[in-house]
Amino acid sequence: MRQSELIRAAYEGKNTLVIKNANVVNVFTDEIVRADVAVYEDVIIGVGSYSGENEIDAGGAYLAPGFIDAHVHIESSMVIPSSFMKVIMPHGTTTVIADPHEIANVAGAAGIRAMYKLTDELPLRVLFMLPSCVPATPFEHSGAKLVAEDMEQFMHKSRCLLYTSPSPRDRQK
């Protein structure tokens, strides 16, 4: 959906859904306000006073944006990503920023590829940070060895958020 379409829908009042009488949690202003929320298709286009053909009365229930877990090791939960999602989404977390360092220690790049594949179709939005090297220190012994250059294959994936520059140890090679 294009931004111009959303702007037009908001301007013309083309709401596909209006959630009435909600206590809207504004995480930017640290306020809770009683308001209606206008939705066009699957995007919120306004908060204020709205009406529409398809209305839901929230009855004062709280309406908050999805929470973002800024750093998580999904594999440390000892469950697959879909099971992890079933536990966290009912509590409001809709996005996680995962560091697949644990699985990279064991399975290398194949483990990171597996994490991408296992999270491709989930309703949970999973973004990835990339470890700069595996193992984390030269004193560790794990199932795999990766340096920053090995991470290049993941750098341009749409869900890759962060790439750490090579460590001084890697630059000397």
Q: Could you say what each language-model-derived stretch is?
A:
Residues 18, 38, 67-69, 73, ...:
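Short, conserved beta-strand segments within well-ordered enzyme catalytic domains
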Residues 22, 42, 60, 71, ...:
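Divalent metal-coordination and catalytic microenvironments
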Residues 1-18, 23-66:
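Histidine-rich, glycine-flanked metal-binding segment
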Residues 164-172:
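Conserved small/polar residues in nucleotide/adenosyl-binding loops
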Residues 27-30, 77, 142-144:
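Short loop/turn motifs at secondary-structure junctions and domain boundaries
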Residues 61-83:
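Di-metal (Zn2+ and/or Mg2+/Mn2+) metal-binding site signature of metallo-dependent hydrolases
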